[in-house]
């Protein structure tokens, strides 16, 4: 799970608990101008064969955390419960997308959109 905070001109995604270990990342700070879109994606698929794990942990259809190469893009995942997933599309960043589980998707989207 990830918590979302907004500073003046950036959004901080802080990875919680053991997911820091599984994802090999504790936080990401993204400038607001690099965020192209943000939307809820409940019940997103976590198929085993749709990506290549670059650095992270994955149990097919159960848990995915870390950096994955998927559909010709580098994507950061941190998802256990697919019901609370949001997707953040980015430009000018290492990651093309962040696919993360949050406590409250509507609230997280509102924070990101400012």
Which role does the model predict for each range below?
Residues 6, 23-29, 36-114:
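Acidic, Ser/Thr- and proline-rich intrinsically disordered linker/docking segments
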Residues 12-30:
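Short aromatic-glycine motifs in intrinsically disordered, low-complexity regions
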Residues 1-9:
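Polybasic, low-complexity association/targeting segments
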């Amino acid at each position: 799970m990830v918590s979302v905070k907004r500073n003046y001109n950036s959004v901080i995604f802080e990875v919680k608990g053991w997911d820091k270990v599984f994802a090999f990342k504790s936080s990401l700070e993204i400038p607001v101008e690099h965020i192209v879109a943000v939307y809820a994606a409940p019940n997103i698929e976590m198929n085993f064969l749709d990506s290549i794990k670059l650095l992270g942990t994955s149990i097919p259809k159960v848990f995915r955390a870390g950096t994955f190469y998927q559909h010709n893009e580098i994507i950061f995942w941190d998802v256990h419960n697919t019901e609370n997933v949001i997707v953040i599309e980015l430009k000018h960043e290492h990651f093309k997308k962040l696919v993360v589980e949050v406590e409250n998707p509507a609230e997280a989207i509102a924070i990101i959109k400012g």
